[in-house]
């Protein structure tokens, strides 16, 4: 990652007003994924509510010059599962270490060296090099709803 990228995370300790602003930007950054994930908008609403309940954390990467989100990881941290629900890096910043950084930070925050990670079938091949780097293996495939 280059020096023009800053990272931070939002969780239940983030001020309500800031969560609203960040979530608008997150929603915009993730737009376009609706076609790969059934009930995507409903899921995103659920993530927002669980964020305020302390069940989710979002790691965000921002390009300083443009002030735009260029990457994020949405985490679910519960007794039942430690999970990277969403991992996305803008095409303009792929192959620059952003995805690796997000996984490293996810592992640190989840306190689990091998958290569950879900990826749509359409994107599995794109993630293979990153998964190999961290020793992730395909454990299961779930057919879309």
PLM features: what roles do these ranges have?
Residues 39, 85-86, 94, 126:
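Acidic/histidine-enriched, beta-strand-rich ligand/metal-binding domains
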Residues 110-122:
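Conserved GNAT acetyl-CoA-binding A-motif
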Residues 31-65:
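Active-site rim helix/loop that mediates acceptor-substrate recognition in acyltransferases
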Residues 1-44:
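Short amphipathic alpha-helix that is part of the acyltransferase structural core
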Residues 121-144:
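Conserved active-site alpha-helix within GNAT-family acetyltransferase domains
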Residues 89, 95-109:
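Conserved acetyl-CoA-binding loop-helix of GNAT-fold acetyltransferases
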């Amino acid at each position: 990652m280059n020096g023009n990228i800053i990272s931070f995370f939002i969780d239940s300790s983030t001020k309500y007003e800031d969560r609203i602003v960040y979530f608008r930007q997150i929603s915009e950054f993730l737009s376009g994924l609706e076609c790969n994930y059934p009930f995507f908008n409903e899921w995103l609403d659920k993530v927002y509510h669980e964020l305020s309940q302390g069940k989710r954390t979002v790691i965000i990467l921002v390009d300083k010059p443009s002030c735009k989100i260029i990457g994020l990881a949405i985490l679910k941290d519960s007794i039942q599962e430690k999970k990277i629900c969403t991992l996305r890096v803008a095409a303009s910043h792929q192959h620059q270490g952003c995805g690796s950084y997000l996984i490293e930070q996810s592992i640190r925050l989840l306190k689990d060296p091998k958290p569950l990670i879900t990826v749509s079938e359409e994107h599995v091949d794109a993630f293979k090099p990153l998964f190999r780097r961290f020793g992730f293996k395909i454990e299961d495939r779930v057919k879309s709803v």
